[in-house]
Amino acid sequence: MNVWTKFFQPPKHIKEIEDQEVVKKKYKYWRIRIFYSMFIGYIFYYFTRKSFTFAMPTLIADLGFDKAQLGIIGSTLYFSYGISKFVSGVMSDQSNPRYFMAIGLMITGLTNIFFGMSSSIVLFALWWGLNGWFQGWGWPPCARLLTHWYAKSERGTWWSVWSTSHNIGGALIPILTGFIIDYSGWRGAMYVPGILCIGMGLVLINRLRDTPQSLGLPPIEKYKRDPHHAHHEGKSASEGTEEIERELSTREILFTYVLTNQWLWFLAAASFFIYIVRMAVNDWSALFLIETKHYAAVKANFCVSLFEIGGLFGMLVAGWLSDKISKGNRGPMNVLFSLGLLFAILGMWFSRSHNQWWVDGTLLFVIGFFLYGPQMMIGLAAAELSHKKAAGTASGFTGWFAYFGATFAGYPLGKVTDVWGWKGFFIALLACASIALLLFLPTWNATEKNTRSKA
């Protein structure tokens, strides 16, 4: 723990720069630099997370595994990733995101390379489970950076734009693996992303930094004169800034701002079911199109890319609407988008007798649009309904539930599909989307103010 503390501990705050013109110039520079660095870095996390998914059809043909066996491999990643998101969230709230995010990315690159060197289910599960653990090092440091460098009054926009990194990464990896598989098989589709991510990890060490105060800049609330954190407790802006900049103990983070927060439990439970749908569509839709409509792998993977692109637009629209229409309250958009998701899944099932790829691509685009809105908003709402210094833990807590749910998109859903066919697959998705909608309803008016009043 001593070695961990020395290596990963956040840098100390330095004397605040007094020249306001210098402060303004430096804030502008570092906000842009940190944003594009963590944005691109998270795209690369997706390269090592989803490489196996799109190599799966070729791996089946090469090694003869069935869907349930491959589902086990997928479930090991989601299970270890889910636990890691919570544990890593606690660690990241007390760590330097510069090294935390970068080292995690490099280790995921190594696990992809070792996966490509293996041929047995046991080794596949081992490397993919280890990959899942270090995938959990990607998101919590981003939550920490987003809450320290961007004020609440603007955070919905910045958060939604950053969240499109999920979709860009998810859209690029099937195209990348599709071309690599054509030239060097599924093993090459594991090696190349792994090598790229090791290199990107070194770039992150160079580009990222921790809090504004570690660079001599004032806290973002002071710089932006953001009243949100102070006014809901009846404090002055300066008192509110001092309170939210106070470092919290692990006990305070867990038992004051996370585990006793009723809204986080609703969000976490909804996230469980949203992620079953998300990972099911992402992991199995290409195989669905190949088996039922006999599409070539490249065409099926392209349709899945449209799912990610739809999600990109969905997150941007959801973030903008929650800022402008519901005034920073994320609950209404979660409910409305979940309702749209239900109808989009129904449309995909009823189109199963049509073999036009553009119809399937459009429907996957619409599913992505309505699914990624609440998927993004859950993490944002969790961070805002807890505490600035507990943002990584709060988002990690909901992420823990999310990826525990995602494990059900692996072996359990693979078994459902083996036994009841694709009809059973779609019934499961509809059930999950319906439950998520019901869980979002109580959070319609959830805000920081009524979170504190119930504490």
Swiss-Prot record:
Keywords noted in UniProt: Cell membrane, Membrane, Sugar transport, Transmembrane, Transmembrane helix, Transport
One Gene Ontology biological process: phosphate ion transmembrane transport
GO cellular component labels: plasma membrane
Pfam families, A to Z: MFS_1
Molecular functions (GO terms): glucose 6-phosphate:phosphate antiporter activity
Transmembrane segments: 34-54, 70-90, 113-133, 161-181, 185-205, 257-277, 302-322, 331-351, 363-383, 394-414, 424-444
SUPFAM superfamilies: MFS general substrate transporter
Protein origin, superkingdom: Bacteria
Membrane topology category: Multi-pass membrane protein
Subcellular location(s) of the protein: Cell membrane
Record-linked NCBIfam families: 2A0104
Annotated function: Transport protein for sugar phosphate uptake.
Similarity comment: family membership: Belongs to the major facilitator superfamily. Organophosphate:Pi antiporter (OPA) (TC 2.A.1.4) family.
Name of the protein described by the UniProt record: Probable hexose phosphate transport protein
Organism: Chlamydia pneumoniae (Chlamydophila pneumoniae)
